[in-house]
Amino acid sequence: AAAAALGDALAGVTHGLHRDVLSHLYDGVAGSLSRLRTVGVEAAHERSAHLSSAPDSAPLERTLYRLLTDLVIIGRTAGQPLPDMVTAGVGPALAEASAAVGSYLRDCGAALLTGKAPPPRRPVEHALGACGAAFAAARGTGWLRNLTDVELERFFAIGFALEQLRDHLEDLDHEVADWGTAARPARVSAASQ
């Protein structure tokens, strides 16, 4: 749910997203996180009774909630499209980032389900780096002088959200790696019996 929602929100920055669509995206991700929290509480009870050796889901939950916050910030900027002159400069980089982030999140989800190592982060790092460069280039062109205060606020908010997203995806990488490491001994142990 998060992969599709972040991808849609990033795409919406260039062409705009209706508030109802954004609300639906948020609800889907929040529902998934709520289900994860329920499973996490049950797993904590099992761990405390020594019925399970599953990793603690709390750090993963915190990271996913941070990603939800990134989605909300990006979604708020996507309510109205950025002006064409800005979109021309940052749109291609945002499209690349949208695809890379969506793919990375889907692959992280698959890794969590299978207990495997996280996917390579290089493509998403490259795409978000290209976004940062595109936003820096846009700041240097003088285009921003022609923006209204609201447009300027949205421009800087999306830049900030992308920086936060990069940090939170790095955190997610660590959490997926921890889950994969915790799952590997259990699989090896089960296979040897």
Model-derived features with residue positions:
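Non-transmembrane accessory domains of multi-pass membrane transporters/channels
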Residues: A1-E61, V101, L105-R121
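Soluble C-terminal extramembrane regulatory/interaction domains of multi-pass membrane proteins
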Residues: A3-L10, T63-S192
